[in-house]
Swiss-Prot record:
Entry keyword annotation includes Cell wall biogenesis/degradation: no
Organism: Influenza A virus (strain A/China:Nanchang/11/1996 H1N1)
UniProt name for this protein: Neuraminidase
Region (Hypervariable stalk region): 36-90
Residue positions with a glycan: N44, N58, N63, N70, N88, N146, N235, N434, N455
Taxonomic lineage of the native organism: Viruses, Riboviria, Orthornavirae, Negarnaviricota, Polyploviricotina
Enzymatic reactions: Hydrolysis of alpha-(2->3)-, alpha-(2->6)-, alpha-(2->8)- glycosidic linkages of terminal sialic acid residues in oligosaccharides, glycoproteins, glycolipids, colominic acid and synthetic substrates
Quaternary structure note: Homotetramer.
Post-translational modification (record): N-glycosylated.
Other facts: The influenza A genome consist of 8 RNA segments. Genetic variation of hemagglutinin and/or neuraminidase genes results in the emergence of new influenza strains. The mechanism of variation can be the result of point mutations or the result of genetic reassortment between segments of two different strains.
GO cellular component, as recorded: host cell plasma membrane; membrane; virion membrane
Amino acid sequence: MNPNQKIITIGSISIAIGIISLMLQIGNIISIWASHSIQTGSQNHTGICNQRIITYENSTWVNHTYVNINNTNVVAGKDKTSVTLAGNSSLCSISGWAIYTKDNSIRIGSKGDVFVMREPFISCSHLECRTFFLTQGALLNDKHSNGTVKDRSPYRALMSCPLGEAPSPYNSKFESVAWSASACHDGMGWLTIGISGPDNGAVAVLKYNGIITETIKSWKKRILRTQESECVCVNGSCFTIMTDGPSNGAASYKIFKIEKGKVIKSIELNAPNSHYEECSCYPDTGTVMCVCRDNWHGSNRPWVSFNQNLDYQIGYICSGVFGDNPRPKDGEGSCNPVTVDGADGVKGFSYKYGNGVWIGRTKSNRLRKGFEMIWDPNGWTDTDSDFSVKQDVVAITDWSGYSGSFVQHPELTGLDCIRPCFWVELVRGRPRENTTIWTSGSSISFCGVNSDTANWSWPDGAELPFTIDK
């Protein structure tokens, strides 16, 4: 074999070996790809271990956790199927209240990015509960927190965050521009109601799944306002109460029936001797019960109950265990307004059980300090001040504030009844603590149980003043 033939032979062998090697590499790549596809079930999630991803599907927050194990991604999540929250069940039988959440917003906000806010409340879908709140468009320990004692400003907004977390720009979702608000879930989407604008011309903006669906203009031009707690959804319809008119005299009160964000019916209450503000409402066997604030002349709380056709009944809690603040010492109650210390008030709630009533109230008669739950077995209808259970929640030496009801439907809990719950706002700063330039709050919440509970104090606990205040 001459030299040229040797060169040609060696070159041919090298080319053949190269082609075989290339084919083997291609086969290896195909094999790896096929194996990976089988392992992951054709899912394409990549990333580090324990990566938490939150998606917003069908207007309900759904949590997924992807765990990467040897290149195999396993996904766990909740069923996102929409339901209709019926609200037809009765309230669960309870013997006390178990601590549910505490967000420690003010304590965390001394060092972290936490919103200045007030009027927090909680509402639950069939998948989760969320904290809603009215921010002041400012952060704690920042110059824009100055002057946030003001209730109504163009910087206020309704936002929401995961339950039990301090509300920050990193975990909160914008809902509506608002200085008065409500929100609830019908099983298919969130309804939000945000009121903003001038005192003599405010407008309520209704959104369903984040889209504006309706507006309601102030009809008395006297500070249109709503619940500052959750609205109520029953069989696909949601209900809320709004007030327009004086805070120290007879005003106008309307109930609205809303479906998928559209008002389909409304009525005005005929209640010339009653005053309804900041109602705390809940469903019970297909009807809606609201317990409200009388800022005009009652130290006991007014109530209104109505069915899905908006046929309603009104009254006052008769018990001599008075629920408002300020209020007189417990004594002889009335099924009409108790006018002693009846002026002014604070948002609150109660739960009716037959002739009995769970009353939530501040421990102080004069200041928004402390909080307690009292069971009066005949208090809905009888006027004496006898009660059988008192559970301490916040000590009288610590600040409280607004409080309100929320419920957990059977579709969420798996129970055969509606679980009653409540939240308490723990206000810090001005006007009572003048060492600060700001006003804000944290919150705690409790749910009713038929088992052991604790008597204790769960105060805000922040040490004031902050750096910005000095």
